[in-house]
Amino acid sequence: MDKLVIAGKAYSSRLLVGTGKYRDFDETRTAVDASGAEIITVAIRRTNLGQNPEEPSLLDVLPPSEYTLLPNTAGCYTVEDAVRTLRLARELLDGHTLVKLEVLGDPKTLYPNIVETLKAAEILIKEGFQVMVYTSDDPIAARQLEEIGCVAIMPLASLIGSGMGILNPWNLQIIIENAKVPVIVDAGVGTASDAAIAMELGCDGVLMNTAIAAAQNPVLMASAMKKAVEAGREAYLAGRMPKKLYSASPSSPVEGVIGNMSGK
């Protein structure tokens, strides 16, 4: 069976989802279930995982026994903040080491700061973390992050929360062709066709949050995204027909057609 393998663990779903921007935890759980996702990313700086005992905890609706939680460093702009946040996550989740690193460079665009990301990744990997890393669609940056030991490369399709879809498929294709670890599109997906295109390009998975949470019907969109990722993956494995401006061979046979029969 075709599985997504990250850091030695196999997953049936290639759709990863976030937990922010929903109306409440109940809607979060319902949408996650509809998506079929097994890996759920959580913003440690914005989500209660037990650090505030007086408030409801996300772990009550998305327990680690049912999902692989992926703590992330959303909102971090420095190496120090990112590393501190993931150390806290490891404490809150009883030694959990699979994490998503993002070090942002600009509060308006939320574009990644690659220099700081490389520094933070190196520190975290030395401390035993398995780092899935948010990055730009720069193939050189992606290669450098893989070389220092990141277990998955997560290039943006377009800016976080923009819903603009895949703006540079050529760079993504270069990253995919060169990578020896999973490549998961992270950020910019707006609708199901974007997810399908990412998978058709050969991405190993797609991570999204706003595309589902900001939809008019988040649960229905989660279901659509599940199907899109599955369809895109199957299309990639099947191998599409080559593109041609003109086709000299019709899809239906002409032999035996009235008017083409010999002797008539």
From Swiss-Prot:
Cellular location(s): Cytoplasm
Gene Ontology biological-process entries: thiamine diphosphate biosynthetic process
Binding site for 1-deoxy-D-xylulose 5-phosphate: G161, A187, G188, N209, T210
InterPro entries referenced in this protein's UniProt entry, alphabetically: Aldolase_TIM (IPR013785), Thiazole_synthase_ThiG (IPR033983), ThiG (IPR008867)
SUPFAM superfamilies: ThiG-like
Enzyme Commission identifier(s): 2.8.1.10
Active-site residue list: K100 (schiff-base intermediate with dxp)
GO MF, one example: thiazole synthase activity
Catalytic reactions on record: [ThiS sulfur-carrier protein]-C-terminal-Gly-aminoethanethioate + 2-iminoacetate + 1-deoxy-D-xylulose 5-phosphate = [ThiS sulfur-carrier protein]-C-terminal Gly-Gly + 2-[(2R,5Z)-2-carboxy-4-methylthiazol-5(2H)-ylidene]ethyl phosphate + 2 H2O + H(+)
One Pfam family recorded for the sequence: ThiG
GO CC, any one term: cytoplasm
Subunit: Homotetramer. Forms heterodimers with either ThiH or ThiS.
Similarity field: Belongs to the ThiG family.
Protein's recorded name: Thiazole synthase
Species per Swiss-Prot/TrEMBL record: Nitrosospira multiformis (strain ATCC 25196 / NCIMB 11849 / C 71)
